[in-house]
């Protein structure tokens, strides 16, 4: 959990307030998790750091550049394992860092931006809660369809990134 500090002028204006949670059970629900990939590249760890009782540090240009390269690669590698082409995915639910990143990932995958649910203009970047808030809104507005793939993708401090493939049941 991240708490904004007023003295963090360089990043405080970037983040909105939000929280999210996800319930995973053995019972049948709206969707099932098919598979996931998670990656770490410590060579970029200084570009996005969050330490206990210290202000967040972020090199925004480097973070967006790395995320716009690494997230599409993670999504592609995950989808290839299941012979799914990116345009055949029902929806992409990403960490809502900024609209530019979402559009760059869509372009890199050759998918219309409309398939990438976005609420960044409504809430801003709510940090680790952003993808869960987006998923909850998308689920209420559109929802999972039986058998249809949905991709979740995010990145964060350390430098970590990953993707998760789900299917509607």
Model-found features: residue ranges?
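Short, small-residue-biased leader/transition segments that mark boundaries at the very start
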Residues: 1-2
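Claisen-condensing/thiolase-fold acyl-transfer catalytic domains that form or cleave C-C bonds
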Residues: 90-169
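Preference for short coil/turn "hinge" residues that link or interrupt alpha-helices
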Residues: 8, 41, 56, 77, ...
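Short, surface-exposed connector motifs at secondary-structure boundaries
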Residues: 83-88
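Short, well-ordered amphipathic alpha-helical segments that serve as non-catalytic structural scaffolds
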Residues: 66-82, 133-138
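A broadly tuned preference for mixed-charge, low-complexity surface segments
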Residues: 40-51, 74-78, 82, 143-160
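Condensing-enzyme catalytic core mediating Claisen C-C bond formation in acyl metabolism
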Residues: 6-69, 73, 155, 168-169
